[in-house]
Amino acid sequence: MSLTLINVLAAALIALAFVAVNAAYLVWAERRGAAFIQRRLGPVENGPWGLLQPPVDGIKLMTKQLVIPGGVDKILFMVAPVLAMFPALMSFVTIPFSENIVAHNMDIGLLVILAFASFAGLAILLAGWSSRNKYSMMAAIRAVSQTIAYEIPMLITAITVVLVSGSVDFIEIVHSQSGGFWHWNLWPLKPGLFNIFMPISFLIFFICSLAETNRAPFDLGEAESELVAGFHTEYSSMGFGLFFMGEYANIVIGACLTTLLFLGGWDCPFGLFPGVWWFLIKIYILIFTFIWIRWTFPRTTIYGLLNLSWKILIPLSLINLLLTAGFIKVFAP
């Protein structure tokens, strides 16, 4: 076995551990945050402040029987949860947490992650189709149409950032934002490049990240009041657990991408923390924002969801891309 393959496998195991811990304790954080917003206590029974609740829930999921309903396509039914989790693990392998902390740096890291993101729709479609359940199938169709609709403006916005930074390598993108928070791609008047449209790019990318992770108010694929539990209605035990971990892993990936593309990555404007800690602070602030939005805004309708993308975000992102290219041509040094 080659050294490169060993390194990739080790990186995948580290990514799996990182995803598992984050998925477990982001559930705890979300439950505590929801309780605070709704003036409840949240989980408090297992350990201080309920901190042992995630491992207890994990043990419960792993010890439950995996029930395969009659009439399902067994092969696709078993493959779908793995396919939902695998792209998230591979994405973490290419994400740099600082200039020196990256499992496997790639010159095309942004393209790789955006390519892996497209697998999410396939996993959802396989889960709905193989379940032979009308609610699961309807939820899968909703979720896939949502994924396709919001991948387009996300990709266009990512191209806008590539134009500004001149690279698809995450480390180069972060380097183009170094020198203080006023150099981040978030700001409209970045020194040396008068790009007044970057706040629009950030807003579009953030909205698309919410929609791509099926988070409220865009959780139409799991609308409990309409579709039981959505595309994973028939799943139990670790089949459900893999979908659950994949969802929270995608939340972390969305926060990482937003931080790398718009918030300077591990660049620290004050020099108070090492780069990796500053990077983690940024992504967890974004994750808290995801949680806050979920428990603040009501679920939209499927028509409103698709109209927002096809009629507003896609045209706006295209106009933004063209104007950004024009400004770079005119004003770039």
From Swiss-Prot:
Predominant cellular place of this UniProt entry's protein: membrane
Catalyzed chemical reaction(s): a quinone + NADH + 5 H(+)(in) = a quinol + NAD(+) + 4 H(+)(out)
GO biological process: aerobic respiration
EC category name: translocase
EC number: 7.1.1.-
Membrane topology: Multi-pass membrane protein
Keywords from the UniProt entry: Cell inner membrane, Cell membrane, Membrane, NAD, Quinone, Translocase, Transmembrane, Transmembrane helix, Ubiquinone
One example GO MF annotation: NADH dehydrogenase activity
Pfam family, one: NADHdh
Stated role: NDH-1 shuttles electrons from NADH, via FMN and iron-sulfur (Fe-S) centers, to quinones in the respiratory chain. The immediate electron acceptor for the enzyme in this species is believed to be ubiquinone. Couples the redox reaction to proton translocation (for every two electrons transferred, four hydrogen ions are translocated across the cytoplasmic membrane), and thus conserves the redox energy in a proton gradient. This subunit may bind ubiquinone.
UniProt similarity note: Belongs to the complex I subunit 1 family.
Assembly and interaction partners: NDH-1 is composed of 14 different subunits. Subunits NuoA, H, J, K, L, M, N constitute the membrane sector of the complex.
Name this polypeptide is given: NADH-quinone oxidoreductase subunit H
